[in-house]
C-alpha cells in the first residue's frame, strides 16, 4: 500500500491544508499527517489540539476517508519521519511561484537525503491560494473574521482561544 507523508506545522489547519490533504487522499490510500514540533517555536495550539482539529476537519470534509489518515508528531527531519511511518511519497502543497522555488530546493535536498522518497506537489485550489496559517493567526489575533480561511471547527477554536 502506498503511504504519503504530509508534513507541516498546521498551526492552525487552514482550508489550504485541508484542500491538499483531500487531494492526497484522491491519489493514495493512506496519508500520515506529520505535525512538526519545533523547540524554538511556541505554537498557538498544542500538538493534541492540532491533531484533533485536523481529524475533525477531515471527518467533516470527507467522512468516508477520515480513517485513512493518521496524525503524528515529529521533531526531526521530515524525510526521517516519513520513512519511520512507511511513506514513499512526501506531499507538499503549492500556492504560487514563490512556493515552487522554495519547495523545489527542499525537494532536491530531501532527494539527496532520502532517494527512496518521492516529493509530490499538489496545487492549492484557487480559493485557498492566498491563505497562510501565519496570516490566519495574525488576522484572528487582531479580532478579524477568519471563517473564510479555515474549517468551521478551527474558526471556533481560534475564537475560543483568543476571547478576552
Curated annotation (Swiss-Prot):
Cofactor(s) of this protein: Mg(2+)
Cellular compartments per GO CC? cytoplasm
Question: For binding ATP, which residues are annotated in this chain's numbering?
Answer: 9-10, 17, 93-95, 103, 128-134
CDD domains registered for this protein in UniProt: PPAT
Subcellular location per the Swiss-Prot or TrEMBL entry: Cytoplasm
Specify the domain of life of the species encoding this protein. Answer: Bacteria
- Tell me the pathway: Cofactor biosynthesis; coenzyme A biosynthesis; CoA from (R)-pantothenate: step 4/5
- Annotated site, Transition state stabilizer, chain positions: 17
Q: Which Pfam families match?
A: CTP_transf_like
Q: Which UniProt keywords apply?
A: ATP-binding, Coenzyme A biosynthesis, Cytoplasm, Magnesium, Nucleotide-binding, Nucleotidyltransferase, Transferase
The record's Gene3D superfamilies line, in alphabetical order, gives: HUPs
Q: EC annotation?
A: 2.7.7.3
Question: Of which family is this protein a member?
Answer: Belongs to the bacterial CoaD family.
Give the quaternary structure. Homohexamer.
Its protein name is Phosphopantetheine adenylyltransferase
State the encoding gene: coaD
